[in-house]
Amino acid sequence: MSNEEKNLMNEEQEFNQLIQERRQKFFDLQAEGKDPFEVTKVERTHTSEEIKSNFEELEDKEVTVAGRLMSKRVHGKAGFSDIHDRYGKIQLYIKINDVGEERLKEYKSFDIGDFVTITGTVFKTRTGEVSIHITDFKLIAKSLKPLPEKWHGLKDPDLRYRQRYVDLIVNEDVRDTFMKRTKIIKYMREFLDAKDYIEVETPVLSPIAGGAAARPFTTHHNALDIDMYLRIATELYLKRLIVGGFEKVYEIGKNFRNEGIDIRHNPEFTMIELYEAYADYNDMMEITENMVAYIAEKVCGNTKVKYEETEIEFRPPWKRITMVDSVKEYSGVDFNEIKTDEEARELVKGKDFELKKKLEDCTKADILNLFFEEYVEKNLIQPTFVCDYPVEISPLSKKKNDNPEYTERFEGFVYGRELCNAYTELNDPIVQKERFIQQLKERELGDDEAFMMDEDFINALEIGMPPTGGLGIGVDRLVMFLTDSHSIRDVILFPTMKPTHN
């Protein structure tokens, strides 16, 4: 057995010994007729932050706080401790003359991680730290397991994700990330509400998985005896609301895609989609750059943020470039000069590109998109709108009047990663049905991410939908950029994980 294995075994034994000691304390309390979980409600007068912020008016006054005991340095007849609540920590001071010998002994028996209420007077130590001089206390919830930050379990990088509750307790920067996430979504709503958008809710379960090119999760509705899908996008329902007369709508919600997991993808993720009648994709660019800049300013205090040691400037206007021009800039190939699918396929021969279908089935649009992914994306570091995507890969977008081979669609990129996707929405029901039929052919060729036919959506378009601009932003990715987080797992409280056992 190696020294490392011996150390791990010793740590495991010590950890288990601590668990046994805590359980014994719990049993001892029960034997004394005390229940450490009997408290149902706590009346606290202040939080740690309120006491620190209002020290001058609270000095020498009695307060009651509650929280988790996170450090304890009590020896002999006096000592200090730290208690943590949602807002931070505050130091505690206890002295035998104030509480008596038996009560001090009881306090010393508390473990790190226990929840307690503390009553005492506010003062400052000689070093200037705002503290509470304890006059009374009560155990309100016993921690039966020690926090694992000093034990081998935390060396497993997955433990932070599997046991996020522990991660949040011991890592202040993790708590800060998720507080920022909350604020990002708050200011997203604030921005749109101020522009007279209304927030709505659309179905998570649907008989058709539409609105995006993705593989869905399938489930079965027993009462109706039909297969249903977890939504992959909110788009088609939101556009039905535009048809119904809701001229500005948005939804922030979960989407589900039955695909791979990596640092940028989680099967369950958060999107915001918004739609505005009488607007186009230029309006959506303006909304995107202004909203993201507004959120960055509110959350980070600046539109310039650091991401992986690179400064990203979100201040409008963002760079705009067409897809064709971007491919020409970074690959040297001008797709305006490519006239046929055959010519486009020749460009791929001899290159180690990953194709979603057989090369002979690829079109010029497929090859253009392939070149963009291979040569361009990684170079789009500063916020950039890539505009005018081919019709064939944009089945819900309206054609450009001056160049019908392409659509009024853009994707926003930051640090080489897609942040958002937007269109001038296709509102011609006849053309939309033709596009859906073409997508069905793509499915027959093996593209299981191609769109499904949605007859009810076609019916809605036949009722009539005004010219409309639509936008979708990946909330998780935006949070990553604004918190300098390098994995999507770092911004989702409980990311999808492979089970460690059956």
UniProtKB/Swiss-Prot annotation:
It holds the Pfam family tRNA_anti-codon. Its main location: cytoplasm. Its EC number is 6.1.1.6. Mg(2+) 2 binds at residue 418. Its cofactor is Mg(2+). It catalyses: tRNA(Lys) + L-lysine + ATP = L-lysyl-tRNA(Lys) + AMP + diphosphate. Gene3D superfamilies: Bira Bifunctional Protein, Domain 2, Nucleic acid-binding proteins. It comes from the Bacteria. InterPro entries: Aa-tRNA-synt_II (IPR004364), aa-tRNA-synth_II (IPR006195), aa-tRNA-synth_II/BPL/LPL (IPR045864), Lys-tRNA-ligase_II (IPR002313), Lys-tRNA-ligase_II_bac/euk (IPR034762), Lys-tRNA-ligase_II_N (IPR044136), Lys-tRNA-synth_II_C (IPR018149), NA-bd_OB-fold (IPR012340). It is found in: Cytoplasm. PROSITE patterns: AA_TRNA_LIGASE_II (PS50862). Belongs to the class-II aminoacyl-tRNA synthetase family. This is Lysine--tRNA ligase.
